[in-house]
A protein has these predicted regions:
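PLP-dependent amino-acid enzyme catalytic core
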Residues: 1-148
Length: 148
């Protein structure tokens, strides 16, 4: 199996320019580890999210791009929301668990996490130049109205 993402900085100057741009506009990106375990996001940052509308194109909503959002899409749950399909419905004895992706911010779909997961490794390794490249995002599924 090959490693799809660089594990070392590829272009330090591109990385430094990206970091400077994010600092200039006051954006702090979540670590992938924070999205995997959102309870590790610093308490002041979690508290600041209370004032952010989950549907707004606010970069702080990136801290909500995980499976642990509550039904209100503002709070966190310990266990991600899911359904367990019974044998009577599926015809199989194995439990089939369906994770619900409608709790994600901005477009109420997990596609934002997939896009972030592809873009952020390139940002931190200097492979994505904010000045000379454009990101392509997945369709929001809202009749080609664009992405966030």
């Amino acid at each position: 199996m090959s490693n799809l993402f660089a594990t070392e900085v590829v272009d330090a100057s591109v990385r430094q320019r990206a970091a400077a741009r994010f600092r200039q506009v006051g954006v702090r990106l979540p670590k992938l580890s924070e999205l995997a375990r959102p309870e590790t996001i610093e308490a002041p940052l979690r508290a600041a999210l209370d004032a952010v509308d989950p549907d707004s194109a606010d970069p702080r909503n990136l801290f909500r791009v995980h499976w642990h959002n509550g039904i209100d899409r503002r709070t966190q749950t310990v266990v991600p929301c899911h359904l367990v399909l019974p044998e009577a419905l599926t015809g199989v004895r194995a439990k089939i668990i369906v994770a619900l992706g409608d709790r994600f911010p901005m477009i109420a779909a997990h596609k934002v996490l997939a896009a972030y997961g592809c873009l952020v490794p390139r940002l931190v390794t200097g492979q994505f130049d904010l000045d000379n490249q454009r990101a392509v995002w997945p369709s929001t599924g809202k009749y080609c109205l664009g992405g966030v």
